[in-house]
Amino acid sequence: MITMKIIKTEYDKIKPYITKDGSIIRELLHPNIYKGVKQSLAEAIVPVGSKTLLHKHYTSEEIYYILEGRGLMTLDNEKFEVKKGDTIYIPPKTPHKIENIGNVPLKILCCSYPPYSHEDTEILE
């Protein structure tokens, strides 16, 4: 039998912060907080009428899952609309940003591997 440590977070106890790209982030799981975790999972919120800055991550790949709202995603030279239920894969070194084009906050579940770090992120605009 394999023994494991159960990690459970409580949303209301996680303090949000503003990241380099301008989105409001809640780190749901991150190895800086929970030892043994190998990736990061965060909720990003882009307020109505706002967008993130164009940026890229040198080593991290990201997966975005749209929880709520509508957005205009820029991924390298492509632009396309996203909505609740959509999933977007973002390879390392790929310039990307997202704009809230809806009338409610755009909520995104972001999974990163290796885990998100400010040092791995370059703002491009």
Curated annotation (Swiss-Prot):
SUPFAM superfamilies: RmlC-like cupins. Residues 45-110 form the Cupin type-2 domain. InterPro entries: Cupin_2, PKS_Associated_Protein, RmlC-like_jellyroll, RmlC_Cupin_sf. This is Uncharacterized protein MJ1618. It comes from Methanocaldococcus jannaschii (strain ATCC 43067 / DSM 2661 / JAL-1 / JCM 10045 / NBRC 100440) (Methanococcus jannaschii).
